[in-house]
From Swiss-Prot:
Organism of derivation: Pseudomonas aeruginosa (strain ATCC 15692 / DSM 22644 / CIP 104116 / JCM 14847 / LMG 12228 / 1C / PRS 101 / PAO1)
Superkingdom of origin organism: Bacteria
InterPro entries given in the database record: ATP-grasp (IPR011761), ATP_grasp_subdomain_1 (IPR013815), Glut_synth_pro (IPR006284), GSHS_ATP-bd (IPR004218), GSHS_N (IPR004215), PreATP-grasp_dom_sf (IPR016185)
Group of enzyme by EC: ligase
Taxonomy of the source species: Bacteria, Pseudomonadati, Pseudomonadota, Gammaproteobacteria, Pseudomonadales
Name of the protein described by the UniProt record: Glutathione synthetase
Cofactor note as given: Binds 1 Mg(2+) or Mn(2+) ion per subunit.
Protein residues bound to ATP: 152-208
């Protein structure tokens, strides 16, 4: 099967070779003989109603000293690619939204876009999880300090975080009696002008914030537990957490079964569920990571499984 695969990502020269999931995907695609084409967000544009890209043929290598090679740039309609991986990291800003508009045009013209552009817009990574109340801890979203204070008083120990953060940035823990609630709320809500999320604190975070990877609605059988550094409440690797790969628990599988059909329905082919203890806390749809860490521990070949799912979708068209 001859496949032309494009990727939209952050600069490939600056990725973390050991941990980058996009590189794992590209290596798996190239191993199948698929042709790779590299783009950054700035390379997408529209002309005469056609979404186009300034793209460069790409080769990738499993070599920490030289992991990519780019050829000369060409200008092509995006729909001439069979599949496009949208792997641009947050922030989820206007430029990200505009990129989804362009990718959606390519999708309408025949390209498979992973993940579906409309769902990237619709499924905020924190807010989307609130659709699954059977899986989540007590949670609320508000920008009013009085409503948030009521939640804090009810649960006594809570986490407060922005709806658009990543990597554990701007996450605060508030405990009953802490005098800093006012400044936390002012900072996160920007003085009542921005919605934020509050969740009951889960002490199970000490055992790790688990990243469960989902491929076409089905879980990879192993996850990465991201264990907080000493004195931290955030397990994110970007915040200094330590990753430990482990098999899924029965509760993890139950959560995946609750969420999976909705992901498949929305064209969310590759997703990361964040689970603390028995509770779903976030659903990461934009650029989920942790492929390489899990692969290294259990030889799961997650990139291959994702390419299998993509090939199946292309064959079904």
């Amino acid at each position: 099967m001859s496949v032309r695969l494009g990727i939209v990502m952050d600069p490939i020269a600056r990725i973390n070779f050991k941990k980058d999931s996009s590189l794992a995907m590209l290596l798996a695609a190239q191993a199948r003989g698929w042709s790779l084409f590299y783009m950054e967000q700035q390379d997408l544009y529209q002309k005469a109603g056609v979404a186009r890209g300034r793209m460069r043929p790409l080769k990738v290598f499993n070599d920490a000293s030289r992991w990519f090679e780019l050829e000369a740039e060409s200008d092509q309609p995006l729909h001439e690619l069979d599949v496009i991986l949208m792997r641009k990291d947050p922030p989820f800003d206007n430029e990200f939204v505009y990129s989804t508009y362009l990718l959606e045009q390519a999708e309408r013209a025949g390209a498979l876009v992973v993940n579906r552009p409309q769902s990237l817009r619709d499924c905020n990574e924190k807010f989307f999880a609130t659709q699954f109340t059977q899986c989540t801890p007590p949670t609320m979203v508000s920008r009013r300090s009085d409503i948030l204070r009521e939640f804090a008083a009810e649960h006594r120990d809570i986490i407060l975080k922005p709806l658009d953060g990543m990597g554990g940035s701007s996450i605060f823990r508030h405990r009953e009696g802490d005098p800093n609630l006012s400044v936390i709320l002012e900072t996160l809500t920007q003085h009542g002008s921005q919605q934020i999320m509050a969740q009951r604190y889960l002490p199970e975070i000490k055992d790790g914030d688990k990243r469960i990877l989902m491929i076409d609605g089905e879980p990879v059988p192993y996850c990465l537990a991201r264990i907080p550094a000493q004195g931290e409440t955030r397990g994110n690797l970007a915040a200094g957490g330590r990753g430990v790969a482990q098999p899924l628990s029965e509760r993890d599988r139950w959560i995946a079964a609750e969420v999976g059909p909705h992901l498949r329905e929305r064209g969310l082919l590759f997703v990361g569920l964040d689970v603390i203890g028995d509770y779903l806390t976030e659903i990461n749809v934009t650029s989920p990571t942790c492929i390489r860490e899990i692969d290294q521990a259990f030889d799961t070949r997650i990139g291959d499984k994702l390419m299998d799912a993509i090939a199946a979708q292309l064959a079904a068209r």
